């Protein structure tokens, strides 16, 4: 990160922001860009000019990259900066923005409508939620807009329907071993994307966009997925990736996003991933120059204090017996797999069940997944169809205790004496977190404390919901997961309704792109495979706009598979740092642990 910032400082010494251009941004009265956002716009202009032959320095190579990756810390304003730059640099064709359905509402309300005057800009939201007759949209229609905003799902549907991704494939030669196999996936050519007669969402693939901006670009960072293939089929003269975490799991994460931007130095993920060649190419091709990284310190901005509480919970009684039984069974399956008696996929499924069991055995006991051995071991957990046994789990009880301890003192739905509730909250917080936590906390009643709870399992959130309803009925909350239809309304309720203090979210839906600074507490029910997801989740509330101290509660089952996952995450952090922080002292590449047979065996203690 330091190397990239030094290069940017050198760049800004001979390139200056055009004040006249900035004055034409048409921001609403009272709003202006931060200095670091102006620097990003300067850098974007430099990168787009760099691809033009007349502006290219002698001997300077771009390796095909036309744009780059904007990796600002969450909350530094990637959305506003991207919008401002696109409005400032209009061209004959519009700019296309691709984001998730959940975050699309944020682009509309917290981006376009909040900062820009509608009289000066035109934005089309290409989604059925915003356009009833979306199938009638034509190229001529979208040409009247400055920016078109759509979602990854819309792109996926349109691309698969038209098979546009096939134009990106390089197939093996007839006489080679790779005959009829995909050798490489390239960006689609302009001549293939200039299809003026297409209608509906297909216009995404029939328009040579001036620029394409992919928000939360780590969503397509796995080159094996259909999403990656469909995004590669979107043509843009310039391409930009917006992400707070460009590397999450593997070295190919950064490669896939650079390939979308046009990188041609290494065209196959296999070559990038082989024996540390990716890091070598990254440095030799000076790809750090195509990535703008910035922290809050770099931006000279400060945030309120953030306190992380790592809480361990012990399994006891029948829950412990069930967990150990499934652990033993998973180890047995692993040994069979090593002798080719069962598949890796089956063992991986057992591993997921083990993770669920660490939270509550109830999570792994739907009728379709039960077997006779589980029925015998799980007894009341298996027979319980409504979660009554599940809410007795140590972790669920601890989370309910945390929620009560930080919200009871100012719950607007309670009729109890506020002073007694305040003492109760202090007493409970002391039992949970200790005296140091009490000393650092302000328990004075002001605005009701709001709390966000994250989990990777929807069934876990369902279980927590039942526990809250039984043990803390006055606590009002909303839950948003993959099946939730009215997400925007529920987010607005959490943010604006003083009586709604809780928001239960799956990581997949809520860990990216949302601004939820109304909350000051965050609970992570279980560890994810990478800390980047946790950091994204925490950044929903610990970001620009937050004025209060933030508390994060990580709940881990002691001696369980969860502790092993935390260790795996550390290795991934080191790998990401070896790329983005420019650590020249690293003589050999730092390899991220993969979820393969070796890693799985290590986590199982084999």
Swiss-Prot record:
- Statement: the UniProt record of this protein carries the keyword Hydrolase: yes
Q: Name one Pfam family in it.
A: Helicase_C
Q: What is this protein called?
A: Putative helicase 172L
Q: What is its EC number?
A: 3.6.4.-
- Domain Helicase ATP-binding span(s) in chain numbering: 59-264
Query: Family assignment?
Result: Belongs to the SNF2/RAD54 helicase family.
Q: Name one GO biological process term.
A: DNA repair
Alphabetical keyword list: ATP-binding, Helicase, Hydrolase, Nucleotide-binding
* Superkingdom of origin organism: Viruses
Q: What class of enzyme is it?
A: hydrolase
Q: Which residues bind ATP?
A: 72-79
Is ATP-binding given among the entry's keywords? yes
The UniProt record lists the Helicase C-terminal domain at 437-586
GO function terms (MF aspect): ATP binding; ATP-dependent activity, acting on DNA; helicase activity; hydrolase activity
Identify the species of origin.
Invertebrate iridescent virus 6
């Amino acid at each position: 990160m330091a190397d990239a910032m030094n290069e940017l400082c050198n760049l800004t010494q001979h390139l200056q922001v055009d004040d006249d251009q900035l004055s034409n941004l048409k921001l609403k009265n009272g709003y202006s860009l931060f200095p670091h956002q102006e620097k990003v716009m300067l850098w974007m202009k430099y990168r787009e000019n760099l691809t033009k032959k007349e502006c290219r320095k002698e001997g300077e190579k771009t390796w095909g990259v036309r744009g780059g990756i904007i990796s600002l810390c969450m909350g530094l304003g990637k959305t506003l900066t991207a919008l401002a730059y696109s409005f400032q640099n209009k061209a004959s064709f519009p700019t296309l923005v691709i984001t998730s359905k959940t975050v699309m509402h944020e682009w509309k309300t917290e981006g376009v409508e909040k900062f820009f005057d509608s009289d000066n800009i035109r934005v089309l939201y290409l989604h059925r939620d915003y356009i009833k007759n979306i199938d009638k949209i034509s190229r001529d229609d979208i040409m009247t807009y400055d920016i078109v905003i759509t979602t990854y799902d819309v792109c996926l549907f349109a691309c698969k329907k038209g098979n546009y991704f096939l134009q990106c494939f390089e197939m093996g030669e007839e006489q080679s071993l790779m005959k009829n196999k995909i050798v490489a996936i390239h960006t689609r050519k302009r001549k293939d994307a200039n299809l003026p007669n297409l209608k509906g969402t297909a216009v995404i693939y029939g328009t040579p966009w001036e620029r394409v901006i992919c928000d939360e670009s780590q969503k397509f960072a796995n080159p094996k997925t259909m999403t990656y293939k469909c995004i590669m089929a979107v043509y843009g003269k310039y391409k930009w990736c917006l992400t707070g975490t460009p590397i999450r799991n593997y070295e190919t994460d950064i490669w896939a996003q650079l390939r979308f931007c046009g990188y041609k130095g290494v065209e196959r993920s296999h070559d990038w991933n082989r024996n540390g060649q990716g890091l070598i190419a990254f440095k030799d091709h000076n790809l750090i120059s195509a990535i703008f990284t910035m922290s809050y310190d770099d931006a000279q901005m400060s945030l309120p204090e953030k306190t992380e509480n790592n809480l361990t919970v012990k399994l006891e009684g029948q829950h412990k017996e069930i967990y150990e039984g499934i652990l033993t069974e998973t180890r047995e399956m692993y040994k069979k797999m090593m002798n080719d008696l069962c598949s890796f996929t089956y063992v991986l499924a057992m591993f997921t069940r083990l993770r669920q069991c660490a939270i509550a055995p109830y999570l792994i006991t739907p009728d379709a997944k039960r077997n006779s051995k589980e029925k015998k071991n799980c007894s009341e957990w298996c027979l319980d169809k409504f979660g009554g046994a599940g809410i007795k789990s140590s972790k669920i009880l601890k989370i309910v205790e945390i929620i009560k301890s930080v919200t009871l003192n100012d719950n607007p739905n309670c009729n109890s004496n506020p002073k007694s509730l305040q003492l109760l909250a202090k007493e409970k917080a002391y039992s949970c977190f200790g005296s140091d936590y009490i000393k650092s906390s302000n328990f004075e009643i002001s605005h009701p404390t709001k709390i966000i709870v994250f989990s990777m399992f929807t069934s876990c959130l369902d279980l927590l919901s039942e526990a809250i309803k039984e043990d803390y009925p006055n606590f009002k909350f909303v839950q948003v997961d993959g099946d939730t239809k009215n997400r925007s309304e529920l987010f607005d309720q959490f943010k604006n309704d003083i009586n709604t203090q809780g928001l239960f979210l799956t990581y997949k839906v809520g860990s990216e792109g949302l601004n939820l600074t109304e909350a000051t507490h965050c609970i992570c029910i279980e560890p994810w495979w990478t800390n980047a997801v946790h950091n994204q989740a925490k950044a929903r509330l610990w970001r620009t706009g937050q004025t209060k101290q933030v508390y994060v509660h990580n709940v881990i089952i002691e001696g369980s598979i969860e502790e092993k996952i935390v260790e795996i995450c550390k290795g991934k952090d080191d790998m990401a740092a070896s790329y983005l922080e420019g650590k020249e002292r690293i003589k050999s590449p730092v390899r991220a642990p993969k979820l393969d047979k070796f890693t799985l065996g290590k986590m199982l203690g084999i």
